Amino acid sequence: MEDAEPNLDILSSAADALAGHYARGTYNELASLLPAVVQSAHQHVQALDGHERRRAHRLRADILVSAGRWLIQVREHDLALMALRDALTDALTADDPVFAAAVVPVQSWALLRQARFDEVEKLCERTADKVEPTKLSKATPDELGAWGHLLLWASAAAARNNRPEEAADYLRAAAAAAARLGRETEVTGRRPFGPLTVAMKEVENILISGRPDRALQLAEQLPQDVGLTYSLAVHRHRIDVAKSQVLLGDAEAATGTLAELRSTVPGWLRHQQSAREVAEDILAARTRMPSAEQRDLADFLGVPA
C-alpha cells in the first residue's frame, strides 16, 4: 500500500479488514497489517485535499480506533490513548461529530483500565450532554448509539467508583435510547447498540456491586430476538456469567462457560484479564484436584494450575 497512488476505496477496504480482524479476535493478523495501513492513511491525508482529504481524515480516524482497541487488548494503554487522541482529532477535522463522540467510549475503556473512574464519568457525561438528541424520536440510529454508548461508559465508571445510584441513572437514560431503536443496530464506531447491549451492561454493573446471584438472574432474562448473537460485547458478557457462576460456587459451570468462549474466540479470550481472574477463581474454589479441562484452560490463559 505504501507505494500506491492514493485510492480511498482501497484504504476503506483496509480499514474494514482491520476492524474485521479485531471483531474476530484475530489479533496477530491485525498487528501484521496495522503498520502499513496506518502509513498509507498518513500518505492519503498528505496527498489529498478538499472533500477527499476530509474523507481520508475520517478513514484514518477509523483505522486509529482499531489500533487503539487492539493496543488496549494487549495492555498498551498509553499508546492506545495516543492513537485515540489522534483519531478524535481526525474525526473533528473530517467534520464528523458523531464519530468523534464514538471515539470517547474507546478512550474511556483505556482510562478505566487505569482505574481513572472519576475522569471517565466526567468525560462521558460532558460529551453526552453535547451530543444528546433534542428529541429521541427524531434522532438517527448513529446519534442514539453515540449518546447511548457514552451513557453506558459513564455508568460503568460510576459502578466501579461505588456510585450505584448514578450508575443506574445513566443506565436508564441509555435504555431510553435503546428503546427507540428496538433492536441491536450497528452504529458509528463499528459497535452494536440496542436493548441487549444495555441489558448486558446492567449485568456487569450488578456483578461489580457484589451481587452475582442477581447478575445471573438478569443474564437469564436478556432480551431475545433483537438481532445480535455474536459480538465482542456478547463474549465479554459471558465472562461476567462465568464470574458469577464461580462466585456462587459452581466452578464446573464457570469452566464450561470459559471453554465455550475458548472454542469460539480463542485469540480474543487469551488476552482477557477478566478471564484469567475467573480461571484463578475456579482453581481456588476446587476442593479436590482440578479436572483435566480446568488445567488445560488455565494453561491456555497463562494461569498456574
Cite the ranges covered by each PLM segment:
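Conserved binding/catalytic microenvironments
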Residues: 2-305
